[in-house]
Amino acid sequence: MDMDMDTSPSYFDPEALSVRDQFRRYRKRHSTSPHEEMLSSNVSENRLLYDGHNIHSPTNTALLLENIKEEVDNFHTDHYEGTPTNPISASRRESVGILNDDDEALFRRVESQSLKACKIENDELAESGDTTFALFASLFDSALQGLMSIPNLMLRLEESCRNVSQSIRYGSDIRHRAVEDKLMRQKAQLLLGEAASWSLLWNLYGKGTDEVPENLILIPSTSHLEACQFVLNDHTAQLCLRIVMWLEELASKSLDLERKVQGSHVGTYLPNAGVWHHTQRYLKKNGSNADTLHHLDFDAPTREHARLLPDDYKQDESVLEDVWTLIRAGRIEEACDLCRSAGQSWRAATLCPFSGMDMFPSIEALVKNGENRTLQAIEQESGFGNQLRLWKWASYCASEKIAEQDGGKHEVAVFATQCSNLNRMLPICTDWESACWAMAKSWLDVQVDLELAQSKPGLTERFKSCIDESPEATQNGCQASFGPEDWPLHVLNQQPRDLPALLQKLHSGEMVHEAVVRGCKEQHRQIQMNLMLGDISHLLDIIWSWIAPLEDDQSNFRPHGDPHMIKFGAHMVLVLRLLFTDEINDSFKEKLNNVGDLILHMYAMFLFSKQHEELVGIYASQLARHRCIELFVHMMELRMHSSVHVKYKIFLSAMEYLSFSPVDDLHGNFEEIVDRVLSRSREIKLAKYDPSIDVAEQHRQQSLQKAIAIQWLCFTPPSTIKDVKDVTSKLLLRSLMHSNILFREFALIAMWRVPATPVGAHTLLSYLAEPLKQLSENPDTLEDYVSENLQEFQDWNEYYSCDAKYRNWLKFQLENAEVTELSEEENQKAVVAAKETLDSSLSLLLRQDNPWMTFLEDHVFESEEYLFLELHATAMLCLPSGECLRPDATVCAALMSALYSSVSEEVVLDRQLMVNVSISSRDSYCIEVVLRCLAIKGDGLGPHNANDGGILSAVAAAGFKGSDIYGTYFSFTYDLPPFSIEIWGCELTRFQAGVTMDISRLDAWYSSKEGSLETPATYIVRGLCRRCCLPELVLRSMQVSVSLMESGNPPEDHDELIELVASDETGFLSLFSRQQLQEFMLFEREYRMSQLELQEELSSP
């Protein structure tokens, strides 16, 4: 990708404080309504098909029947497979994104591989993921609709992660094997890491910033009040404060969990556990020795350079370890209570020196202290901040003295926390969170101390000179001479200079525990450190680097927790987009859109691979327009042969979260998705034929694949969407339009007189039965544009009904031919089938008011210079046996010449007819035929009253009908009393006899002089269908009539059929080829001969 991976926007630079202040990283507190959670939980349930108790309004009969079937099949199971666990409400907010060429190439590479990769990834997180997919989607859906504030969303995400983690780790009493238990611990830990990241994001970007209450502003001010105001206004200090509070909050929640699970936590000791009972008894009994202290006051071990007895020492260290743990969790009061209960009230006094006041520099601590004026009184007497500096200096001296005498490490650390003595805290910080807390808290306290020291004259210059010196010079040169008035020079050079230096110290500091260094390499720690730095750009890059397919192995994910990171990354992208709406520059906006779309796309396909199709729409709706469309098209194609239930979930997901029609250039919409699906379903696929099965038959079966695509338009849209009636009408219109296109193609490959039913056409009819039934129940929704397409659909419905009855009759004929003697019942069945076939065919052929397949054109061009017509066809050449003729250059050239010869040379010149035949680039068994000619009045210009498709239809019909031995452009007369029929038409010449074209795709267009296609010329294809279907229907009727006559059941309307063909008014004669008319006359001859034979039998005695 053409993006700078090492830089971030300037407003995320921790050094550029003024810019960061303008960015308003810390927002004003939002007022949270108690109704928000209720709103988010009461999201519309209309979107679920089945929620465990009720079936929700899918009106499609096929879908309802399949739901019932699945319920019966799964009657004894507790979980309904494929059903979402939580109701998801509609989302209308979408994101924007623009890719450059490199990003687009990367996106397409990922799209082509990600679904396969998602399918074979490790399923370690499947169990826990199933409980969070729908939950997280529901939360984000509520946030996108404005039902939940963004800060509240972050808190809910953290809470959800914690709850699921606890459920995995402690929710089951079942004993697991060692490997399973390890995996469950890993899952729970990953979710805790995610919860920590959400908590940090809330502390940094979601938590409000309170102002100092007016009633707490004191005059003269106090050191604590000044410290709180400084931290409130200084960006770096505020950042440190929030990091410290975040880490203390994590530690506190960990203690609560320990108490919840184990029933107890730190500090649960017997009273007076720290009174050194063993040492007391030893002194009373044995006196003392050199190594044992002589007095029992709290300062005795340090003053006498002596030790407690081992048992008391261990007990004391245990108490101090718990005191440290409570301080680390921000529970100072509990730590003081522990000290008092252990008999060490003096230690509690060292923790809270100012009458128990909380001296933490936060507004919360200030409010907690209330209007207490103790500190103000103290500082009025001793001077501003003097007592505070004295206390910290004393704590520093104590920590150093105890450390020098190898005292307890926790006692050293407890004193060190009071004075920012980082070097004495880090040795007991054996995890990343503790080390980060120690550094951030020390740095925060020193920043506050430096600010408070500004009131002392001359001290500022000493601070600057001390900072300029190296840490070694400061440590060895003048630190020993520092007194309380010099605070905080004693610990100044222990602190980082900025936040990147703090994080670098975590990575490679000499005093940092190796476990801390290892923790820096964990994924969520890296995420959290980038959030602290505000380097969101780099954060997106590293998340994408973790989940992107490997360059050398596109079929697999990297084996380090990618499913979890995909989910987290997608949700992080959505939160960041909601947070940074108007406050970002173009470069960062581009990064957030580009890389964010890649991550969202990956997660959407991951959900798809886990059969959570109903959740995909929430995330897909946030993708850029083209990505959203491509994603849904890809999913629909992969689920093309899935159950109705699964396909309906995808349909609902798209309908609910996307607009139906295009709204702008940024957002995806259902119309474009379904148009792309339908268009791609008609494309010629790369040839993959089974050599053991006839290629031509496999080619005809492709019609089923085209028909299945129409089902996406036949579902009932949910009643919750906007303008549902209008959407329903548009779906019906598109389904009718596309079905008519397919019906035309299917009719041209269903000319073979075999019993097999054309599966594609009848699949279309079955899909459209339900929408048309609903249309009949609501006739008010029928608009003119729907009516026109509906009329053609009804024509095709009638035609395929005739076709089905003919094939049913043909089936009887073939079955009866194998039996020597038929029973009366079998004969009667054949006769009934024949009469039904003949009656339905004549009903279609004899229509007077609205002849079959004759309509007014949508686009009628009266006059236009250089308007051309084009017909594009992809077809397979078939021998008379039905087998495929594989084309080569010679065959193509011969067919092209034959098509030219099917019309006169005068027509070729006048109409500028051009014919091109070539082998298909995608299927070597198929040919591509392109016909082009000049439009003239009556054929392209003005109304087309002949309804025969014009010259292009005539040339194409010659190819579909094939050639006989005498193929040419002909005109002659048949005389067969009592009728005289003049014959003319187009035939192929100089081409193999009996070879016909089986259509794969057929389109006709109006085109410009330059060859650009303008609008469809539907009349050409309809006319072609009339040229091919009506003569075939007549011939089939003749075949059935002959059969009835031979069986002694003469049809009543045979002469009417002959008159229909011979009549000039119907124009049927122009639709026949010479070969078809020859067959027609042969059938008529057979009919007359059978009639004479029957008359002779009846007249004979």
Curated annotation (Swiss-Prot):
Primary localization: nucleus
Alphabetical list of Pfam families matching this protein:
Nup84_Nup100
Q: Where in the cell is it found?
A: Nucleus envelope; Nucleus, Nuclear pore complex
Molecular function (GO) terms listed?
structural constituent of nuclear pore
Q: Could you list this entry's UniProt keywords, alphabetically sorted.
A: mRNA transport, Nuclear pore complex, Nucleus, Protein transport, Translocation, Transport
Look up the record and report any one GO term of the cellular component aspect. nuclear pore
| InterPro entries linked | Nup84/Nup107
Q: Name one GO biological process term.
A: protein transport
Q: Which Gene3D superfamilies match?
A: 1.10.3450.20, 1.20.190.50
Similarity remark: Belongs to the nucleoporin Nup84/Nup107 family.
Assembly and partners are described as: Part of the nuclear pore complex (NPC). The NPC has an eight-fold symmetrical structure comprising a central transport channel and two rings, the cytoplasmic and nuclear rings, to which eight filaments are attached. The cytoplasmic filaments have loose ends, while the nuclear filaments are joined in a distal ring, forming a nuclear basket. NPCs are highly dynamic in configuration and composition, and can be devided in 3 subcomplexes, the NUP62 subcomplex, the NUP107-160 subcomplex and the NUP93 subcomplex, containing approximately 30 different nucleoporin proteins.
- Protein's UniProt name: Nuclear pore complex protein NUP107
**Source species of the chain:** Arabidopsis thaliana
Primary gene name: NUP107
